[in-house]
A protein has these predicted regions:
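Phosphate/diphosphate ligand-binding glycine-rich loop within oxidoreductases
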Residues: 2, 15-132
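ADP-ribose/adenylate-binding Rossmann-like module
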Residues: 100-106, 209, 223-260
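Conserved S-adenosyl-L-methionine
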Residues: 159-164, 249-252
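Short acidic low-complexity segments
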Residues: 186-200, 222
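Rossmann-like NAD(P)-binding element
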Residues: 195-216, 231
Length: 275
């Protein structure tokens, strides 16, 4: 249903039948910030293109992609929770890291109209970490969540040189699968983690926990110490409860918005064919 947008009036609309489209698909979708940021980036690059949100449930995703792909003016697709693994199955080609992870967050058209996918969550997260003064190399890291974003971040932490990566996820099958594949890279120690953050230099929440006011903290935040770096992938609220506790304890932190800014840059470069 249409909602009142009086508090956010549109100043200028330059849309025509020539405008190219990129969808961002998720369930839920109301929390995403990509439509405005990606659309602005298209404009800044001199492109007549828009990023449009689509709320699609997992049960409907395959049919939606099938029909959406028939639209000749759709050039790209951004996948968010929970569709990053499912969207990989719709890619005819993909980057090596996407193949390793079995997940994508961005898709663009091949010359024959099929989809080529890549995953930038991990690369963007580690670049954002570094910009915040946190060098992963040689550190012990705990990541909570082995979903699409968590898997990508875990992979990039390993390739960035962490000494040990502990993975915690309530879905033990998913957790163990990721741990096994990462261990096969022979880049560092991979272990099974828990919600206890003690002993880790880097602690990252890569789950949706914290989006709702009554969510439990993904880790035992009372155990944070001021020498830890604590990060989160959540963009709404701006300061998730876990991050609030970490800051109160003197930890350096990074929010989902910090990650999103870098991931957005990488996605746009991919979508416009600059990478």
């Amino acid at each position: 249903m249409f909602e009142d947008a009086a508090s956010n009036p549109v100043k200028t609309l330059n849309i025509s039948g020539k405008t190219r489209l990129c969808f961002i698909v998720g369930d839920p979708i109301a929390q995403v910030k990509s439509p405005a940021s990606v659309s602005q980036a298209f404009h800044d690059a001199g492109l007549d293109a828009l990023c449009v949100p689509a709320h699609v449930t997992p049960a409907d995703l395959a049919g939606w992609i099938e029909h959406m792909s028939k639209a000749k003016n759709v050039d790209g697709l951004i996948a968010t929770v929970p569709h990053k693994f499912a969207c990989f199955a719709h890619c005819a080609t993909a980057s090596d890291r996407a193949v390793f992870l079995g997940a994508v967050n961005t898709m663009r058209r091949n010359q024959d109209g099929t989809w080529h996918g890549d995953m930038f969550d991990g690369m963007g997260y580690v670049e954002a970490l570094t910009s915040k003064g946190c060098n992963p190399e040689g550190q012990r890291a705990l990541i909570v969540g082995a979903g699409g974003a968590g898997s990508a971040i875990a992979y990039s932490l390993m390739t960035a040189g962490v000494a040990e990566l502990a993975i915690h996820d309530e879905d033990h099958v998913r957790r163990d699968s990721l741990a096994g594949r990462l261990a096969g890279l022979n880049l560092g120690k991979v272990s099974i983690g828990s919600p206890d953050p003690r002993g880790f230099g880097i602690v990252i929440n890569a789950t949706p926990l914290g989006m709702k006011p009554d969510d439990l903290h993904p880790v035992v935040s009372g155990h944070f110490t001021s020498d830890q770096f604590v990060g989160c992938v959540i963009t709404v609220p701006a300061v998730p409860p876990m991050i609030g506790v970490a800051r109160a304890k003197g930890c350096n932190t990074m929010t989902g918005a910090d990650m999103f800014a870098r991931v957005c840059d990488l996605m746009v470069q991919f979508l416009i064919g600059a990478s």
